[in-house]
């Protein structure tokens, strides 16, 4: 229980991302503590970095996070509406992308009528671009390292499907995408 160990006693903590690592450790993104930790199977912390969070909240600090092959971390910050890449040893932000609103007004809620930039998931592609599930932005964006959108799919672009809260992303071996869509 992340609220009872590793310095989190008495804090409201939510863990939104876990990743088993090749060395046998587990990466965990802790919202509330605002950090990424790598622990062994006994819960001992072997590495940690603090995250840059503009609008701290234990439910919205992070969503999906992944350790990249280069050792850095790619982290979605739902409350900040941003995806950040952190240098794996120092925690320095080395890349950041703020999810655009595309000139639209924010609308509360969780369904297709809501709108915002509460980003949920991101995947680093083999070409170096980042595929981003924009949460209540109802879209998936492919963004270059220079932050240029080179591909996107929006709320009503798929026949018979309305994108609402776009969450998870997976790139299949054949290059196709699996897109999580809920609410």
Regions found by a protein language model. Give the residues of each.
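Histidine-/acidic-rich catalytic cores in large beta-rich domains
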Residues: 1-183
């Amino acid at each position: 229980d992340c609220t009872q160990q590793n310095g989190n006693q008495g804090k409201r903590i939510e863990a939104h991302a876990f990743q088993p690592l090749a060395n046998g450790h587990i990466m965990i993104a802790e919202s509330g503590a605002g950090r990424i930790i790598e622990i062994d199977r006994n819960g001992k912390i072997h590495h940690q970095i603090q995250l840059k969070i503009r609008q701290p909240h234990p439910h919205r600090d992070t969503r999906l996070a992944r350790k990249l092959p280069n050792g850095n971390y790619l982290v979605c910050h739902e409350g900040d509406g941003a995806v950040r890449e952190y240098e794996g040893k120092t925690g320095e932000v080395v890349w950041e992308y703020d999810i655009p609103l595309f000139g639209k007004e924010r609308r509360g809620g969780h369904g297709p009528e809501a709108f915002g930039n509460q980003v949920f998931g991101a995947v680093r592609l083999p070409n170096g671009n980042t595929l981003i599930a924009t949460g209540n932005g109802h879209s998936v964006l492919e963004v270059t390292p220079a932050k240029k959108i080179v591909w996107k799919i929006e709320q009503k672009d798929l026949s018979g499907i309305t994108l609402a809260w776009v969450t998870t992303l997976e790139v299949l071996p054949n290059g196709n995408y699996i897109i999580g869509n809920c609410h």
